[in-house]
Each structure stands twice: as C-alpha cells, then as structure tokens.
Amino acid sequence: MAKAPANNAAQRVRKKVRKNVADGIAHVHASFNNTIITITDRQGNALSWASSGGQGFKGSRKSTPFAAQVASEVAGRAAVEQGIKNLDVEIKGPGPGRESSVRALAALGIRINSIADVTPVPHNGCRPQKRRRI
C-alpha cells in the first residue's frame, strides 16, 4: 500500500507578520558585481531585502545603476507595507549602485533623514590582493 503524500507545503507556509515600524535603516551594500539593499528597524531586525541579482539581472547587468534602482524599489515597497516612513541610509562599498539606490528609495515617498558612508577602510591592515592584469 502506498501512502498518500502528506500536504507538507500547507504546513510550512508561514504567515507574514506585518510590523508597524515608522523608522528604519536602509543598508546598501554596493560592490562592483552586485548591489544588496536590506531595510531594518532601529534594532537591526530585517524588514525587507532585495538584490540586483535577485531581480533577474545576471552577469555584468547586475552591476548597473538601473539594477540597483530596481532592487531598491522592491525592498522599499516591502518596507512601506511594514509601515516604514523614515529611513537613515548607510552605504557600504564603491559600486555603481550607490546613488541610484538612494534616489529610488526617495522616489517611493520615504523620507530620508541621513545618508552615511560606512565603507570599511583599513588602517593599513591586511595586504590587498594582487593587481589585476587584463
């Protein structure tokens, strides 16, 4: 006798918890290959996130300002559904999506309180990788 397949999919579905958070922090990680945007509350609990690669951009198109803009819009819309109205933006990295991601968040009607560059800069710590030769 074969068992009937258990309906595990219905058991694993988690109900999305909607939080009412007015203030938050947008962490923008802009590398040369991708841009990742995470929107958190003041305590650091993630409310929403998106990346350029997750929005369907692959290869060199991930590292464009337009891909960062699309990812910011997706993360921003999800954060607005959670009740976000004000954001502090922390940008990390030298990538091309730095400015366009902030503009996309502002275009959604989210008030941007401050923009901070938190790119880690070594005080001559580890030796960098070898020079790239093309």
Curated annotation (Swiss-Prot):
Organism name: Variovorax paradoxus (strain S110)
Gene name in the database record: rpsK
Xref: NCBIfam families: PRK05309.1, uS11_bact
PROSITE patterns: RIBOSOMAL_S11 (PS00054)
Membership in a protein family: Belongs to the universal ribosomal protein uS11 family.
GO CC field: ribonucleoprotein complex; ribosome
Name of protein: Small ribosomal subunit protein uS11
Keyword match Coiled coil: no
Any single Pfam family the record assigns to this protein: Ribosomal_S11
